[in-house]
């Protein structure tokens, strides 16, 4: 979900009219996975372009930045629903485009994440969750609480208990140049849908679906690993 304030929600309602018209053309013209990758890269390039212009206080550039984020989100969702390859293709062209793809080992669950470039030192991220049930692919963008900047997922780990398979998503949030946050979020696929709140982590207060902590980035900046993983 892109928008975390009421004003931004109004932007999405307006631009979704445009995206709806775009969606009609997507239903008509099939594309290869390579063509889809090229198209997604073009939108990411435009996001960078309008983010740069918006820093120069060009109001119209910020509107265009919001629009590009919405279109990218909606295109991803539509392409995933139509093309099962979206859960396994490597998307090597997008690796250096502020775009992250985390995939479960069984390739039945994938999270696409990108920096919307709408913030300053605090980064706001969008995600699209994609999963497969009986060879049918599903996708949606999760809803975030108002004011939550979201984060990107670098990894998905797969575990199995005596009953079922479940997944651990490794999320990173950039709250400022110094302050960052990491968490593990537990997912499972049940009753034909993705459960974002699968409570498998035992804490002193009971079972929870997420476990995370804040830290000072400058205290670990010397680590060579990127992204830094502290769990």
What do the predicted segments below correspond to?
Residues 117-120, 174-177:
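Short glycine/acidic-enriched loop and turn motifs that connect beta-strands
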Residues 83, 136-143, 148:
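Trp- and S/T/G-rich repeat-edge/linker motifs of beta-rich repeat architectures
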């Amino acid at each position: 979900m892109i928008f975390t304030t009421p004003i931004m929600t109004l932007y999405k309602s307006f631009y979704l009219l445009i995206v709806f018209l775009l969606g009609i053309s997507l239903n008509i013209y099939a594309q290869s996975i390579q063509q889809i990758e090229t198209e997604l890269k073009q939108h990411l390039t435009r996001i960078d372009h309008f983010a740069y212009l918006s820093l120069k206080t060009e109001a119209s550039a910020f509107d265009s930045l919001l629009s590009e984020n919405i279109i990218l989100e909606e295109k991803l969702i539509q392409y995933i629903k139509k093309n099962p390859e979206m859960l396994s293709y490597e998307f090597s062209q997008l690796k250096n485009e502020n775009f992250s793809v985390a995939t479960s080992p069984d390739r039945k669950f994938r999270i696409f994440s990108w920096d919307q470039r709408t913030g300053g030192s605090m980064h706001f991220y969008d995600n699209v969750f994609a999963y497969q049930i009986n060879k049918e692919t599903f996708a949606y963008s999760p809803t975030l609480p108002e004011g939550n900047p979201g984060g990107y997922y670098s990894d998905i780990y797969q575990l199995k208990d005596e009953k079922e398979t479940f997944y651990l998503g490794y999320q990173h949030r950039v709250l400022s140049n110094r302050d960052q946050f990491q968490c593990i979020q537990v997912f499972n696929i049940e009753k034909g849908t993705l459960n974002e709140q699968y409570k498998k982590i035992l804490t002193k207060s009971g079972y929870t679906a997420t476990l995370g902590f804040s830290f000072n980035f400058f205290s670990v900046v010397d680590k060579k690993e990127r992204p830094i993983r502290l769990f």
